[in-house]
């Protein structure tokens, strides 16, 4: 059979849904299957997922996308995985059953413990080794919480039966029938346990947090062989031996999917949150502006590539909030339409700090607020201001990056669900004074994992071959007068100032 009749499958395990995609040799997605899964909020600030539900949801999309594409498992040359990062799963290696729900990246239950570590002057200790700042966002304190607060975890640990990992590790373990306990460098670099210089779990950190190395996965390159998918997972008759050869955290995968392979190239993913990454090459750059130094990817035996990252916790999730909680929007896709019904935002600002604020503020005590309300304020103004809040938060990251890089960023490559909003992209170009390029295929997160998997098996020869396949759908240029931009930004900065530390101030 010709090579062009072979395919890559990508599993994209997100925060609210699992998707599986089939990609052909031209880099085209020929089939997608997607299913949402449940979110659990047991207490204020707590966010959990059921790991078995994630696995079953992911598996069902994997099986249905193969059937949708009308291909056999033997037509699939490799499988790539990309996933929500930082979310931690702990399970029994004999039964394969989780000892507790997965604690999600948005969960802030460990805020006070993080405050305690900061008070103990541990900030530099962690930043130097991991490139991260101390924050409940990362896996380390979530894992420590499970080990200390879940009796079943203590019991299994004492018997040497406990395994832990991020979502990629959990999926690899399930896909290989419990044969492989592994993660890739990009996911490991988000745990706050991994030394990004030595590329290994940091023993001093493990000792300090009392986390045994034995429960942690082996860490591999983002593009290399991990293990084979159990044939029976495709169907009872499946014969294909599909290797898992590409693994990356969702944001690093999007950076690769956008082919930001040169130093200084920047992408922003507009998903549940917003994530801006800039490729810094083979050198980790220490941020002076509270951005994260992180591993972008590692291709086989090649040198590790690093990035600077800024994270916005609530972006597309703010539009979901308008739809599900406030009910002033029935369909998230209509936010552009409603925004167009009003000339401007009437100086209304929405600060969607529902789970605190991410970079460059890193304030887990901030709360969301709407400012500038008048008697004449309509739903449309609030919808418009909510869309704009996504651009304002992203702009805060871009400006911090420019300071760290010592240069102006002139081009932003965008992807993710909310990047389909022309109003948001136009506003982003104007507010940040740069060109915005949206690719014809905004599924760059899933494509990144497909490219990583494909390169490892020679499906694509090299990065150059992949670059030729990428097409730009639309270019947005700044269109708002700079004086007006300055006025808008002044209002935004004032609004943010007023929500900082809110919860602590009122307690």
UniProtKB/Swiss-Prot annotation:
Record's catalysed reaction(s): glycerol + ATP = sn-glycerol 3-phosphate + ADP + H(+)
Stated regulation of activity: Inhibited by fructose 1,6-bisphosphate (FBP).
Family matches, as InterPro entries: ATPase_NBD (IPR043129), Carb_kinase_FGGY (IPR000577), Carb_kinase_FGGY_CS (IPR018483), FGGY_C (IPR018485), FGGY_N (IPR018484), Glycerol_kin (IPR005999)
Residues annotated to bind ATP: 15-17, 272, 316, 320, 417
Binding site for ADP: 15, 19, 272, 316, 417
Pfam family, one: FGGY_C
GO CC annotations, alphabetized: cytosol
Keyword Acetylation: no
Enzyme Commission designation: 2.7.1.30
Keywords: ATP-binding, Glycerol metabolism, Kinase, Nucleotide-binding, Transferase
GO MF term set: ATP binding; glycerol kinase activity
GO biological process: glycerol catabolic process; glycerol metabolic process; glycerol-3-phosphate metabolic process
Residues the entry annotates as binding sn-glycerol 3-phosphate: 15, 85-86, 137, 250
Pathway participation: Polyol metabolism; glycerol degradation via glycerol kinase pathway; sn-glycerol 3-phosphate from glycerol: step 1/1
CDD domains recorded: FGGY_EcGK_like (cd07786)
Residue positions binding glycerol: 85-86, 137, 250-251
Gene3D superfamilies: 3.30.420.40
Enzyme class: transferase
PROSITE patterns in alphabetical order: FGGY_KINASES_1 (PS00933), FGGY_KINASES_2 (PS00445)
Protein family (similarity comment): Belongs to the FGGY kinase family.
Function: Key enzyme in the regulation of glycerol uptake and metabolism. Catalyzes the phosphorylation of glycerol to yield sn-glycerol 3-phosphate.
Record-linked HAMAP family: Glycerol_kin (MF_00186)
Protein's UniProt name: Glycerol kinase
Species this chain originates from: Mycoplasmopsis pulmonis (strain UAB CTIP)
């Amino acid at each position: 059979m010709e090579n062009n009749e072979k395919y890559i499958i990508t599993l994209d395990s997100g925060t609210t849904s699992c998707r599986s995609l089939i990609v052909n040799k031209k880099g085209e997605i020929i089939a997608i299957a997607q299913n949402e899964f449940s979110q659990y909020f047991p207490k204020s600030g707590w966010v959990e997922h059921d790991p078995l539900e994630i696995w079953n949801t992911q598996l069902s999309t994997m099986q249905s996308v193969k059937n949708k594409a009308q291909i056999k498992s033997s037509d699939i040359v490799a499988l790539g995985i990309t996933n929500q990062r930082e979310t931690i799963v702990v399970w029994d290696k004999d039964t394969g059953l989780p000892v507790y729900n997965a604690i999600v990246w948005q969960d802030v239950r460990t805020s006070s413990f993080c405050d305690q570590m900061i008070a103990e002057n541990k900030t530099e200790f962690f930043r130097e080794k991991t490139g991260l700042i101390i924050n409940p966002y990362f896996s380390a304190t979530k894992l420590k919480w499970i080990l200390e607060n879940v009796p079943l975890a203590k019991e299994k640990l004492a018997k040497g039966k406990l395994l832990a990992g991020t979502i990629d590790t959990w999926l690899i373990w399930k896909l290989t029938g419990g044969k492989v306990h592994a993660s890739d460098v990009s996911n490991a670099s988000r745990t706050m346990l991994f030394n990004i210089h030595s590329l290994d779990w940091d023993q001093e950190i493990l000792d300090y947090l009392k986390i045994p190395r034995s429960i942690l996965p082996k860490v591999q390159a983002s593009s290399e062989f991990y293990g084979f998918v159990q044939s029976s997972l495709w169907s009872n008759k499946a014969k294909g031996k599909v290797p898992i050869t590409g693994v990356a955290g969702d944001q690093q995968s999007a950076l690769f999917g956008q082919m930001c392979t040169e130093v200084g190239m920047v992408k922003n993913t507009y998903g549940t949150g917003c994530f801006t990454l800039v490729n810094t090459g083979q050198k980790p750059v220490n941020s002076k502006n509270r951005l994260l130094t992180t591993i972008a990817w590692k291709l086989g035996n090649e040198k590790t590539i690093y990035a600077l990252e800024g994270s916005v916790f609530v972006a597309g999730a703010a539009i979901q909030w308008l739809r599900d909680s406030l009910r002033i929007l029935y369909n998230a896709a209509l936010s552009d339409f409603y925004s167009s019904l009003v000339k401007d935002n009437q100086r209304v600002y929405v600060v969607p700090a529902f789970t605190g604020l991410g970079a460059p503020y890193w304030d887990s005590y901030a709360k969301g607020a709407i400012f500038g309300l008048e008697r004449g304020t309509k739903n449309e103004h609030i919808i418009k201001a909510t869309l704009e809040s996504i651009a304002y938060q992203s702009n805060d990251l871009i400006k911090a990056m420019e300071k760290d890089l010592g240069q102006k960023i002139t081009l932003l490559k965008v992807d993710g669900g909310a990047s389909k909003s022309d109003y948001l992209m136009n506003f982003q170009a104007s507010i940040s004074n740069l060109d915005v390029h949206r690719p014809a295929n905004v599924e760059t997160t899933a494509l990144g994992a497909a490219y990583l998997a494909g390169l490892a098996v020679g499906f694509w020869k090299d990065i150059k071959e992949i670059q030729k396949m990428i097409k730009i759908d639309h270019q947005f240029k700044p269109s708002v007068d700079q004086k007006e931009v300055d006025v808008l930004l002044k209002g935004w900065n004032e609004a943010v100032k007023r929500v900082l530390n809110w919860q602590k101030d009122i307690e």
